[in-house]
Amino acid sequence: MSKVITSDSQLAELLSKTKRVAVVGISDKKDRPSNGVSRWLIKNSHFELYFVNPALTTVLDQPCYASLADIPVKIDMVDIFRKVSDIPAVVDEAIAIGAQSIWIQLGLVDEESAERAIAAGLDVAMDLCIKVEYERLAGSISPQE
């Protein structure tokens, strides 16, 4: 059953079962959280990262896609680095591509979008930093093939 992920064990399970992550709202500016978190995840996580920003064609030496639908592989998790008013459209797109989960970054809360994602069968982590949680729970994360 889909839910808002809150406990450490749920977070570790979600991070373990996730392989492909789309970072929506990636910036090419090194001082932006989306860039720093993505650089850390590339070096320190088991994730395959895919980047979404219609204003960019490449970022961090990888292709950058205009939308989630443009990514040529199935995405497990959509990690959102956009302002709250943009979250509903990103959640709709995540549902449309069949993502398994949504990660709404630290400082961002959109209960209505979270409820819509859960109703569509997605797990939701909200108001959490994926880098911080991955680093904190690293000993409990067991990547699955």
In which residue ranges do the predicted regions lie?
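Structural/interface elements that position substrates and couple domains in central-metabolism enzymes
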Residues: 2-75, 88-106, 110-145
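Glycine-rich, N-terminal phosphate-binding loop of Rossmann-like dinucleotide-binding domains
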Residues: 81-82, 106
